[in-house]
Regions:
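N-terminal helix-cap/turn-to-beta initiation motif at the start of protein domains
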Residues: 36-54, 82
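Sec-dependent signal peptide cleavage junction
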Residues: 16-31
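N-terminal glycine/threonine-rich, aromatic-flanked beta-hairpin/loop signature
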Residues: 64-110
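Generic short beta-strand segments
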Residues: 54-61, 84-92, 116, 134-138
């Protein structure tokens, strides 16, 4: 009887350990939500993108970056507001909090804009209702690297 009880307890411990390891698993590119495909029957509007957004996960190419790695690469994780035909970055620095904005165009169900540093960027809607922001930043040589921010509403 004790052997069976011990076996059951060990099995439960192993199950809990495995579940814990899975819960803390590093995000992978393959497990991220898919972009809404361009469908002739679906026409996204500005309202589909509007609101406040924060970065949930960041990828450099297809490699996941921790917040420390994002900072080490000189990239920023800033809240973003999309409203009134503009993409607005909420920047907090030594001067305090201020907004930096860029006008965008909505084409083929994507928001296209160029930030203040000349970096081209694209927002796309995800199948889960969130957004993905792709920035094409200079890297070694002449080849830009795509930095991808998976954006969610702050309350989620």
């Amino acid at each position: 009887m004790m052997k069976k009880l011990f076996s059951v307890l060990m099995a439960l411990c192993l199950l809990c350990t495995a579940a814990s390891a899975l819960a803390e698993e590093t995000p992978t590119w393959e497990k991220m939500p898919l972009v809404v495909t361009v469908d002739e029957d679906v026409e996204l509007t500005d309202a589909d993108f509007e609101g406040d957004w924060i970065a949930d996960k960041v990828f450099y190419g297809t490699d996941y970056l921790t917040p420390e790695e994002v900072e080490a690469k000189g990239l920023a994780i800033r809240p973003v507001r999309i409203a009134g035909g503009k993409v607005i970055n909420i920047v907090t620095d030594e001067a305090g909090e201020h907004e930096v904005s860029a006008e965008y165009t909505l084409e083929n169900n994507q928001i296209l804009f160029t930030d203040g540093e000349g970096i081209e960027a694209v927002f796309e809607k995800l199948e889960d209702g969130n957004l993905v922001l792709s920035l094409f930043v200079p890297a070694e040589g002449d080849t830009p690297v795509c930095v991808t921010y998976f954006m969610v509403h702050p309350e989620t």
